[in-house]
């Protein structure tokens, strides 16, 4: 009984503060300038980003800085295609600003090498074009540009473990500045190659990433990182890849906490039901493995979310067309056991919901389906997590309770180990309590003068914010 009284005594002030702050938040939304509201949300403690592709989260500027610094790229040299020769061979992708490593460059014919220039030798105009080629920043760019061109352009940057590790730290630093506590990102250990082009064993790569995360600059960000391994379901060997990654994650549960499946759904290869038998086979061989799977990232109705739940997923990535499947929608509303990972800016830029006012997010949120906000491929959107929060607040008039529950959901439904999750949740609640106390007074927004948001191209193009780039 004494323990219960103590717990209630600790919890009651938090509840009172939250209740008091609800009215305060409504006043802030009514009276603050757009820039002040954005700054307030930038300073807001946030939980986790649990739908995140590390390769897509890295800003072009971070890629360039690491790839051109021998101290950060493991002594490698990167080249990018600046024009095409007349003897390009059939089957070779004609992708301007496709980036390759020195080992690949040295295997090209002299004519092939003539198409490429070192990243360090680009003119100012070429460098800017290279940077812009790695993000959606122009009218008309959308799904086709993203899937067919941007990923191939980034090319072999993803193979260099030094570059990936260093840009991961830059990503963590940016998240830490926004008040994020947990990043659950999709990144494997199977595709790294050394400077000779030889495959790095997954065990070696996993240890390298683990050691890098233990360094002081990584720890100083205040961001806890865990990985998901991701199967590209459209590949011919997707079933084999699924089995291999399932076994890998089972053997590396300290850092890899779950498994994902990604890839465009708009063909028969994206049909989740074709993997049902394989998942059931794997569950007969391995202990429970947490699954978060992309589903419902489609224009029209289908049953992909339902079929993905049958694979064993406890989290759904995107779920845009879930609203067109009433039976599955009702199931998620009533059970409240499955989290839908919402990616507003991604869904807008990839044209699944060009008009975000029509996004099903508020319907899910306000009918009891657990949801959270995430960035998906923030580097390629040239955005950040605060952009997602600002979009949600200004488009759907979120209440304070809804706003804080989004962060809470991201941690509660994370795949972090129970002890880690409990610590993250406790830290989040304490940070929110301190935040509400700081901004409860009517004149408290004056203290936002000490907050310096860092925004990127998306915020500038969408809202015209004059914050630092």
Describe the residue ranges of each PLM region.
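Bacterial N-terminal signal peptides
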Residues: 6-15
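Positively charged n-region of N-terminal signal peptides that target proteins for export
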Residues: 1-4
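Metal-cofactor-binding active-site regions of metalloenzymes
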Residues: 19-291, 297-315, 321-338, 343-469
């Amino acid at each position: 009984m004494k323990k219960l009284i103590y717990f209630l005594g600790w919890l009651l002030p938090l509840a009172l503060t939250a209740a008091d702050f609800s009215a305060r938040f409504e006043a802030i939304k009514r009276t603050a300038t757009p820039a002040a509201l954005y700054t307030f949300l930038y300073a807001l403690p946030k939980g986790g980003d649990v739908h995140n592709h590390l390769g897509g989260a890295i800003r072009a500027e971070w890629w360039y800085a690491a790839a051109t610094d021998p101290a950060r790229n493991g002594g490698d040299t990167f080249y990018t295609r600046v024009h095409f020769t007349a003897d390009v061979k059939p089957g070779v992708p004609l992708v301007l600003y496709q980036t390759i490593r020195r080992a690949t460059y040295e295997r090209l014919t002299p004519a092939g090498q003539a198409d490429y220039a070192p990243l360090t030798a680009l003119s100012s105009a070429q460098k800017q074009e290279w940077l812009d080629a790695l993000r959606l920043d122009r009218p008309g760019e959308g799904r086709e540009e993203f899937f067919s061109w941007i990923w191939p352009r980034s090319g072999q940057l993803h193979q260099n473990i030094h570059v990936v590790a260093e840009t991961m730290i830059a990503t963590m630093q940016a998240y830490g500045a926004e008040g994020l506590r947990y990043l659950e990102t999709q990144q494997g250990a199977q595709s790294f190659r050394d400077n000779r082009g030889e495959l790095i064993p997954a065990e070696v790569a996993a240890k390298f990433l683990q050691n890098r995360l233990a360094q002081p600059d990584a720890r100083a960000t205040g961001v806890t990182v865990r990985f998901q391994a991701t199967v590209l379901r459209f590949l011919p060997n997707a079933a084999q890849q699924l089995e291999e990654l399932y076994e890998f994650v089972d053997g590396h549960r300290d850092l890899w906490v779950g498994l994902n499946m990604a890839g465009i759904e708009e063909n028969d290869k994206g049909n989740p039901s074709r993997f049902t038998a394989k998942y059931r086979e794997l569950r007969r061989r391995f202990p429970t493995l947490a699954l978060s799977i992309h589903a419902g990232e489609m224009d029209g109705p289908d049953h992909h979310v339902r079929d993905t739940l049958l694979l064993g997923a406890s989290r759904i990535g995107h779920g845009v067309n879930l609203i067109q499947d009433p039976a599955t929608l009702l199931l998620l509303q009533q059970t409240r056991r499955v989290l839908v990972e919402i990616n507003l800016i991604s869904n807008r830029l990839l044209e699944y919901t060009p008009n975000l006012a029509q996004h099903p997010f508020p319907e899910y949120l306000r009918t009891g389906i657990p949801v959270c906000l995430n960035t998906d491929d923030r580097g390629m959107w040239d955005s950040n997590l605060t952009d997602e929060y600002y979009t949600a607040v200004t488009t759907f008039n979120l209440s304070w309770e809804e706003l804080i529950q989004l962060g809470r959901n991201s941690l509660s439904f994370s795949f972090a180990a129970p002890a880690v999750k409990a610590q993250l949740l406790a830290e989040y609640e304490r940070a929110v309590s301190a935040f509400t106390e700081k901004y409860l007074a009517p004149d408290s927004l004056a203290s936002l003068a000490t907050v310096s948001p860092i925004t990127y191209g998306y915020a500038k193009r969408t809202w015209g914010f004059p914050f630092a780039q």
